[in-house]
C-alpha cells in the first residue's frame, strides 16, 4: 500500500511542511504578544514557528486518519509564511554604524526605527497568517489529501 505518485510535483507533500492546526494557531496568538526588540527574541520565535513543521506522510505512510493538518506550502499560506520568516531576519540590518563601538545619535535613532519597523512587519505577517488559518486556508484532512495523491492498496490475492 502506498501513494500513487504520477507527477514529480507530488513529492512536495512528503516534505516537512505540515503542522498541527491548534499548535500553529496557538503559536500565532502567542507570538503576537511577544517583544521583538532584540535579534535573539526574533530568532527564538522564528525557531518556534519552524519547530511546528514536520513531515506527516511518506510514500508508504498514509495521511493521518482523523483531523486536519496545516499545509504551509499551500498557495495561500506559502507567501505569508515566507514573508514572516524573512521579517524575523533583521540581523546586520538594524545597526549599521561608521564606528561600531560608538554609534552616533542619528545611527542609534535609525537603528531604533529599524527595530520598530521589524516589529511592525513581524506582527503584521503573524496577523495575516492567523487570519488565513482562522478562515480554514491551507488545512487538509485525509480525504482532501487523497484527492491530490491517491492511496493505492495492494490487489487481493
Curated annotation (Swiss-Prot):
Domain of life: Viruses
Subcellular location(s) of the protein: Virion
Gene Ontology molecular-function annotations: structural molecule activity
UniProt keyword terms in alphabetical order: Acetylation, Capsid protein, Helical capsid protein, Virion
Signal peptide bounds: none
Presence of the UniProt keyword Phosphoprotein in the record: no
Residues where N-acetylserine is found: 2
Listed name of the protein: Capsid protein
Organism: Ribgrass mosaic virus (strain CAB) (RMV)
Gene of this entry: CP
